[in-house]
Amino acid sequence: DESEQTVSEIDEVTVTEEKVVPAGKRLFNNPNTETTEISKKYKKDRNNETPEGEPITSIDTENSRDIADVYESLEDSPNDPKVQEAYSLMADETAAQHQEIIDAGYEVEIWNGEGEPYANAQEMIDDVRDNKHMWIYSTEAGFGDTAITEEQRQQNKLLQDSGFKDKNGNTLLYNDLFRFVHDFFGHTERGNGFGPVGEENAWDVHSRMYTPLARRAMTTETRGQNSWVNFGPQMRNDKGELIKKGEEGYLSPRERAFAPQKMALMP
């Protein structure tokens, strides 16, 4: 789950030579070039030959609606052995990715201030590139719309202590690590923003670093949840059509509900 870490950026547009698009409105920002080197090293060390992929500049809304429908239909299955295995693998692989980033000299710090730590994606990328630092929201402070239950903590390895600390010695859950590594690899490699197209890029980049079963859990936590938020039932009218900006019933990114939390595997 990355719900509290996502800063919604509205009206994503492509940067062109004719028009300088301000930070916060860009589809792609200036990336952190070292991110690609760290990602390639991680994959090479694990014989991961998944191709790099290409930047995504537009989103297929029909496909995103279908993904949202799949997420909506998923049954929360925390006791399913395959689901347990997938989430455990995802947690372990996320920890290994976190270690790779830390070994390269970067730091993560839990944000306890008011509002958002960054006004837009470029500010986050600049912090990573210039200061080797990233703020994240604590999972304990925000896990969807509700607090973590003890039952969820026992069932889901992502909600357990990872053994890592932030730069101030605060405990990091595996899901805290995921919020960090997902924004690090998913957003700073291509420089993509946080809107729907940016999140599709983040999933596309970062999912390639996981093994197949772990990737399915990771996809549930990213592409599945994001598609539900942006293209799910809350964004449709009585006819099932997507409500466009300016139409009655449209919800701005900050008004949208978080996706319901589920331990399940996207196809």
Where are these regions (language model features)?
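Low-complexity, glycine/serine/proline-rich disordered segments
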Residues: 1-56
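Long acidic/polar interaction regions in large eukaryotic complex-forming proteins
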Residues: 80-170, 174, 178-183
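Surface-exposed polar/charged interaction patches
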Residues: 2, 13-16, 73, 77, ...
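Polybasic, proline/glycine-rich intrinsically disordered low-complexity segments
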Residues: 211-267
